[in-house]
Amino acid sequence: MLVLQRIPKRALQFNGVTGTVCSTRLFHHAFNLNLQQSFVPSEERRYRNSNRGFTRGSDSNSNNKYRNSSYDDNRSRSNYGGDKRNNRNNNNYGNNRNNGSRRRYQDENSDIEVFKSKSFNVTTLNPESFHEQVTIDSLLEESLLDANVHKAISAMKFESLTPVQQRTIKPILTTENDVVAKAKTGTGKTLAFLAPLFQHLISTKLQNPLAVKAVIVTPTRDLAIQIASEVKKLQQCNPSLKSYRSLTLIGGTNLDKSLKDLHTLNPNIIVGTPGRINDILDRVGAKYFKDVDFKVLDEADTLLQIGFQTELSLISRKLNEFNTQGEEHIRTLLFSATMDHNVQELAATIMNKKDCLFIDTVDKNDSEAHDSIDQKLVITKSFAESMVALIQSIESELLQKKNFKAILFLPTVKFVDFFSETLSESLTKRIDIIKFHGKIDQKKRTKLVDRFKKTNHGIFVCTDVGARGMHFPSVEHVYQLCVPTSLPNYIHRIGRTARAGESGAATIFLFREELKFVDELRRDTNVVIKNQEDYLNQDKENFDMISSIITNNPDFPEALKSIIGFYKGVQNEYRLNYKVAQNVLRSFSELHSDSSMLLRFRPSEINNFFSNRDMRFVSDLIDVKNPHSFGKDREFDDEDRYTSRSQNNYKSKQSSKSNRFEGRNDYSNSRRSHANQKRNFTFDD
């Protein structure tokens, strides 16, 4: 049971630092969604290049402010690699199953207040409500779809509309309501809103033909570019639609050029990311965005997970204020693969109409994953085995097939860089390996996406920046190493295969201490990985060869550290404990085939990876040295960064626990004088 509340737009006040939500009246309208409610944490997100900070949208009492970060690895980088304000005493492995980043999925009958204030009528259309077979021909016959739109869609040679398109296009065309739609990933959501938008442009072509009439907001630049390409495809299929122009506004591109294009092109459709759209609205919103009729939020759950709630509220408020037909004129279309509390709360904030249509295209007994995906879990004893097993699995596929197209998801940017090289050196059959993450500049990212779309023989190695909304044709297999950042991300990752009616496979490699993730996945998303197998190291020679390639890569130590930082960031998501860190650290020795080989840390970075309490369990598994004690032979450069050398040289096999921590007291004393350090370095509670 969902209790709806609505927040009036006038009550939203933003002072550039925090977002305060006020309400004078309360209205409850309950209806049965038959859905599990999930809480997905809003993660840190850079909003423009300024010192502007926002409190977390999902927690009005939080005093934590967003630090600058990128979309990739937002969870891991918030805990890895540098910010000393990481509240490390609150980040112990497995201290509290309910604390930290994860809030438990809510029972479907819980009384959650989502919308506040004035009357807000919600009509729910569950899957059982749909009996009519909707086609583009039937829409044309009912005069709901213009012949030009019909011609464009027909030329794209779709055999039929997908269930999502059948259930959403007609309600959007026949009502003036706001629409919230839940649909599995890879089911054709883009056309579900593009078709009605083009129909609207045709219907209103005599009314302000040079005005922006639709704004589409996406979580990532790459998804915005992809949607813009879908717009162009429709126009290419019917050139008469080319009179309706579109413009992509995304970060990583020249702002002045965006402003110039907005002035010269007079676009009718804007596709962009929240940060850049907000920048444009601040500068020229009153001039160019006064006639907007639609705003569309694609992948709404991703927008919130990244931490865009405040920006989305700002966009909605500005568009309403600029609109010449009143603040309640703009229709909202919100599409999401998951429908949790945060998505509902966002909808409450940004919807304008008194009537909302909630369209659920997923049966309550279905899993949230696509049915045509063959899911597999490979269980290993260690992270070392997981890495080797992954490479061996890909090698096996390559040997069996002439062409092979796959996506590999990894947790961090550093590990993507490292593992891409390792994979290239390990595979005996040549294949195009494309690494992709948010640290790559936008121009190159666009080229990489196009390259992978066109190839039929390649592996796309990426972070979660490639998990949401991206459509790559004919992807046969999706691989995952380590748990995903959140449960919904698992759904979106595997959704990169088995798209547009095709079948596909998805394999995740987990060591035993990670298996709590599987239980959480089954309980909260109804996704059951039936095909599970234990990894058996039957070819020791091959295992040793791959291990050697891994350890000979000079970036391996830092890449492995980033994995430890990643697990620290997701420990509360799946209630992981210190044993995960132990396993990863032991993998360093296992891959070297030498129990005395320990992963080295500088004293100054220990707090970024381990809490004081965790040090009880991992102190015997790490090597901590004072960089100032190395003299001429020290392995730290002048900027105090770790530089990799032959691992055989940096530690004596006979070293004891005491000499691994040599100099720690001197270093601790020196840190007392550091102006920005709040507490001394110590290994004790």
From Swiss-Prot:
Major location (coarse): mitochondrion
Superkingdom field: Eukaryota
Residues spanned by motif Q motif: 138-166
GO cellular-component term (any): mitochondrial matrix
Residue stretch of the organelle transit peptide: 1-34
Residue ranges annotated for the Helicase C-terminal domain, each copy included: 386-542
GO molecular function, one term: RNA helicase activity
Sequence ranges of Low complexity compositional bias: 58-69, 88-99, 644-658
Biased composition (Basic and acidic residues): 70-86
Description of its domains: The Q motif is unique to and characteristic of the DEAD box family of RNA helicases and controls ATP binding and hydrolysis.
Entry protein name: ATP-dependent RNA helicase MSS116, mitochondrial
